[in-house]
Structures are given as C-alpha cells and as structure tokens.
Amino acid sequence: EWDKVIGTLSKEHTVYTIDLLGCGKSDKPAITYTCYLYVQLLTDFIRDIIGEKTDIVATGASASFVTAACQNIADQIDHIILVCPESIHALAKAPNHKSKLLAKIINIPIYGTFIYNVGARNTALSDSAECKYLYASILGHYTTVNVAHCLEGLTTSIAVITGKNAPETSQKADEYCHILPSIEHLEVPGSGLLPQRENANAFLEQIDLLLSDNC
C-alpha cells in the first residue's frame, strides 16, 4: 500500500510502517479486535518506540484509531493525515445483537471460515484464514468509534487526502470538515481509493506541502 512512497518520504523523514495486530505480517490471534486495542497499540508505539513528536498518515477505517489515540497523546502528535478515510457515519456504528451474532458465526471453525472466504475475497483481509477473526470483529462493529466525538476539541493539525476519481471519498471528507472546520481537504488527480499508489508523485507533493513546516 505504501511501497511507492516510502523511499521518497524516508529521504527527509524517519518512516515507520506498522502492521497492526491481526493485519499483514503481524500476529493474528483468535481474539475480538477492538478500537480500544488498536488505540493502545498505537499509543504505546508512539510513546515507547518512536519517543518523539510524530506525524501520522493513515488510510480508511484506521481513521478511528488515529483520532481516538490523539485524544490520549495529543501532545505527541504533530500532524494527522487521513487518506480516503471511512465515513464518520460508518465508523460510529456500535456493536448490536445482529452484528455480534454475525461475528460469532464467522468465528465458527468450518461454516464461519467459508463465509469469511466468500465475504473477504479480493479485500486486504483475504490473504490468510487467520484474518477471519479481524474480519469478524470489523463486521461486528467492534473496531469502530465515534470519530465525531474524538474530533471535537482537537487542536492537532489534521488533513484529509482523497482521490479525485472517487467522488464518494470527497463526500466522506466533507463529513470530517463539517465536524472540525480547521481540517484541510486535498485531492490527488488521476487517482481513486489509493492515491498513494495510483498517483504517487502527486500524493507526495501533497504530503510534502502538509509537512513542510516540520523541515
């Protein structure tokens, strides 16, 4: 996801790319993954590993973890850049009886694994059967948080980058700007849901502009 921009960013910044628990090359224990878990992991990583003021660039549903973490350690976060974040409405969904039942069904060894293989096909969670526990947690709304509440009162510099060829991402960005008018919204031409891959040069120009006051 970030392979086309890491090299350039690393020339002027120390770059950490994190595979959160249950994702990518990280461990994938058979647990219920929650927003609180990811907030704690992110908070601990910034405090214990990075150990200095940090800029965060996150995509999609990770917006919930980042904004929630910022409430805990706002003094250690300089900039937040959200790339095509999930809508605030979608991230506000809380676990209910139906979603909890769905999560339990997916966690069933055989039948649940079949549902996972069909439902997660062609997604970032399709590379391993072990990912089904995170998939179940997402569908169960365990990984969501009230982002609108998290944004209120934040003074951290926040920007949203979207792809110009995906107008729905611009609409989602407007939700964030409506909650916190200080949020800056930038569009990357010639790109859709993954501007950092689809037009890496233009994406890097926007990142450089947003982080230029750090240099």
Task: Describe each PLM feature range.
Residues 3, 7, 16-57, 205:
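Active-site loop/oxyanion-hole signature of alpha/beta-hydrolase fold enzymes
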Residues 7, 158-191, 197:
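Conserved loop-alpha-helix segment in the C-terminal half of the alpha/beta-hydrolase fold
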Residues 14, 53-55, 77-79, 184:
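Structural signature of beta-strand start/N-cap positions in the alpha/beta core
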Residues 20-24, 87, 192-195:
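Alpha/beta-hydrolase active-site loop signature
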Residues 58-66:
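Gly/Ala-rich beta-loop-alpha elbow adjacent to hydrolase catalytic centers
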Residues 67-72, 77-109:
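Flexible "cap/lid" loop of the alpha/beta hydrolase fold
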Residues 121-149, 165:
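Hydrophobic, aromatic-rich cap/lid helix
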Residues 183-215:
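Catalytic active-site module of serine/aspartate enzymes centered on a nucleophile-bearing elbow/loop
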